Amino acid sequence: MIRRAKWVVCQLLVVVLLGSGAAAAAGGDGFSTRFVTVPAADGVGLGAMVLEPRALGPHPVAVLISAWGGGATQNVVPAKNLADRGYLVVAYGARGFGESGGAVEVAGAADIADVSTVIDWALANTAADPARVGVGGVSYGAGIGLIAAGADARIRAVASLSGWADLAESLSQNETRHGLAGLVLYLSGKANGTLSAETEKMLTKFLTPHLSDADSEAIIEWSKPRSAVSHLGRINAHRPAVLTIQTWSETVFPPDQMVSLYQSLSGPKRAEFVPGDHASSESGGLLGLPSETWDSVYRWFDAHVAGTDDSITRENPIVTRARPGTQEPETHPDWASAIGEPSRWELPPAEFTLGRDTPANGGMPLATYSLEALTGDPPTAFLPLVSRRDAAIWQQAPRTTPMHIRGALQARFTVTPPARTGTVVAYVYDVDQFGVGRLINYLPYSWKDAEPGRPLRIDLAFAPTAYTVPAGHRVALVTDSKDPLFLDWNLEEGELAFSAPSWLDIPTKGSQG
């Protein structure tokens, strides 16, 4: 009953956004709008919104898949914009969410089959062109769309906004689970949808404080078929044109996996990286605000689905926007051209006590860096308040010229752990003359079977970023052992000692002193 009521409310909102029913009937718009239920093979009904051009077909098709927790009308603004450009648009809620029946499978086999079912329905019930089909989505819809391109050769283009390529890598990095992001997804999924028994089991298992090796392996195996990298051979065989747009500071799906995916794709491709957090760059466009992110989607579909404007194909396929603030985009012919040469910073010995938190942290999932996308200001920490008993802190001399960080920072620590298990979190800051650090990047690392008192090598590969440190500022590295974002393995306190060789490699372009 509640879901039905939401469906009615959503339809009323769409009437307001797209124009009254009377206006539509009078031909005030170049397309008609209707709401349908698309029957899936297993009897599940998928709630969908269909925008069909009034002109004679056949029309290029744009299938828009809802994000986590969303329904058919979540993409109403992009749907209208695509319909205005002559597309037959079918926007639907993924099963288990919105107006759709069934249960949330997290990009399971049924979710992937649903994409083909929606395409089948469009071809059978509208003037859709089977040779011109594109699929797009934000977050959850992006992940489903990428995998579907490997299952259905009719999909000629994909727009993946804040999506993932490797689900296991998204859930955990360096033996450290993204606990707070996982909790947000679990609770929002429960509140806004119907989780399948398997999804419920895996997500609750993932949130167990001290996960067993067997349960960890079970989650990895569950994640594999839900990851585009597992279907890369079929995706490349079908050669869809793939557009990925990712934020630098993703707390759900870090951008490094999208770099790897881009480099592995053999068909037409484009990758854009912008400041912000999960889904922040596309949110304005979903609300009807001007959006360069959605403009790229429309142009990508025009080139590779409708065939009406191929100008985007003549541009450099790698687009990056540096932090902080709003900087002009930098374009590159390939990823190698986008990144800088590493400069090594040798770190002197240090030690601190494990198990106590400090003001250094990665922020709040989906909020902290979304605010940065709006204001241009990264999250900050006042470094003089970071206790040297609870963290190791290294700082460079103030810069005489700007430092243009481009690419992935790399670190190596040689530590002597006090216990068999433990976690460290490394933060890299841009620090001003007052000691206020703006967060450039961060990364956790956990060990679960170390020999106490014996040196342990820790290698960290941060997600890539583009960040310009102003002249007069300095780079600082802070390492502590607690962060609300992560489920750590610090079961007891003890002194963690850093010794040589320990270093941080910073990739820079055109930077001196």
Predicted regions and their residues:
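Glycine/threonine-rich phosphate-binding loop and adjacent beta-strand/alpha-helix elements that clamp
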Residues: D29-S32, V36-A40, T308-G513
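A short loop-to-beta-strand scaffold at the N-terminal edge of the catalytic core in hydrolase folds
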Residues: D42-E52
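Gly/Ser-rich "nucleophile elbow"/oxyanion-hole loop immediately N-terminal to the catalytic nucleophile
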Residues: A55, E105-D111, T117-S139, I155
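Short substrate-entry loop that stabilizes the transition state in hydrolases
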Residues: A55-H59, L64-G101, T251-P254, L485
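Accessory cap/linker subdomain of secreted extracellular hydrolases
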Residues: D84, G136, I147-A237, T308-I312
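Short beta-strand/loop motif that positions the catalytic acidic residue
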Residues: H238, L243-Q246
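Short alpha-helix in the alpha/beta-hydrolase fold that links the catalytic acid
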Residues: P240, F253-Y262
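Catalytic histidine neighborhood in serine/cysteine hydrolases
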Residues: L265-S280
